[in-house]
């Protein structure tokens, strides 16, 4: 009952996320309750989700591009000591990248005349229509763990690009060449990885799930409010709209190339379990 008396079941305790799908909501004594698809009620607060979406292309762009992942002003040269120029750019603003230099321990991107932004605040899509080593067909998905981007290629043309969130240490997304082996429009995901299972999470109706490496999958993440930074248990999180686009494009058997141009992601197989959301 919505009053909280006589519970019929429970979701395991822990510090991880808890999300359920609901069909109705109500306030009882000022407390929010939602009705599950099973007819049961539970105390929970409705949640929104990020509406960011990537870019689809009819032809491959001529240069690299990317997104700002934070609000920031450009600098007149590639240095944090250089004067700020122009207006503050909003998070997820699209940028064109015309030059790249190493300065002060990171990449800096020239996004216009005398306008530079650091990797710390932006992410780059490396446009490369050459199939990665081992890719045998004319369709593939590339996941860049350093830049936290996903690109989709067909007939050696870039057709889609977006920001993602991949596995955070020590739950990295494993580099390698894989194939999508199962697609599910909705999936319930749960798990715990730490001793004592204090990090248990439970996620209902995870949308547009495409498994490619054991329990690691490409999927929508309605709970995530920041893309462009790692932080999953090994899956590759996309916005809801991006996951839907990819799910509709992808076929079972399509190849997924996961790589880290910085070489920082471990490749030792003993460091990788089955993965998770």
What residues fall within each predicted segment?
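Exported/periplasmic cell-wall-interacting domains
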Residues: 130-136, 140, 160-163, 168-177, ...
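A short, compositionally biased
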Residues: 29-30, 68-69, 104-105, 143-148, ...
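Solvent-exposed coil/turn segments that connect beta secondary-structure elements
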Residues: 25, 39-41, 47, 100-102, ...
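Short alpha-helix capping/helix-loop boundary micro-motifs
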Residues: 2-8, 78-85, 240-246
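Cell wall/extracellular polymer interaction/catalysis modules
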Residues: 81-88, 93-175
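Boundary regions of SH3-family modules and the immediately adjacent low-complexity/disordered segments
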Residues: 1-3, 32-72, 110-140, 171, ...
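SH3/SH3-like beta-barrel superfamily modules
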Residues: 3-47, 87-123
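Short, solvent-exposed loop/turn elements at domain surfaces
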Residues: 76-77, 150-152, 187-191
């Amino acid at each position: 009952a919505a009053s909280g008396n006589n519970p019929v079941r429970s979701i395991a305790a822990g510090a991880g996320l808890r999300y359920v799908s609901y069909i109705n909501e109500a306030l009882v004594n000022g407390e929010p309750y939602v009705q599950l698809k099973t007819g049961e009620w539970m105390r929970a607060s409705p949640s929104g989700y990020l509406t960011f979406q990537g870019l689809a292309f009819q032809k491959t762009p001529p240069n690299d591009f990317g997104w700002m992942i934070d609000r920031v002003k450009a600098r007149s040269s590639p240095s944090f000591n250089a004067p700020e120029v122009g207006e503050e750019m909003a998070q997820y603003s699209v940028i064109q990248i015309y030059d790249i230099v190493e300065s002060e321990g990171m990449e800096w991107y020239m996004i216009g005349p005398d306008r530079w932004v650091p990797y710390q605040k932006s992410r780059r899509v490396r446009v490369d229509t050459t199939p990665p080593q081992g890719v045998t067909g004319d369709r593939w998905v590339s996941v860049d763990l350093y830049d936290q981007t996903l690109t989709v290629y067909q007939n050696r043309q870039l057709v889609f690009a977006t920001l993602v969130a991949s596995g955070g240490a020590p739950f990295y997304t494993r580099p390698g060449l894989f194939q999508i082996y199962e697609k599910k429009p909705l999936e319930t995901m749960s798990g715990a990885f730490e001793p004592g299972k204090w990090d248990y999470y439970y996620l209902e109706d995870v949308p547009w799930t495409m498994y490619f490496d054991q329990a690691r999958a490409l999927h929508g993440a309605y709970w995530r409010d920041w893309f462009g930074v790692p932080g999953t248990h090994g899956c590759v999180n996309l916005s809801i709209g991006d996951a839907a686009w990819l799910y509709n494009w992808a076929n079972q058997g399509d190849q997924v190339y996961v790589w880290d141009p910085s070489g920082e992601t471990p490749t030792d197989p003993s460091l990788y379990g089955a993965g998770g959301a």
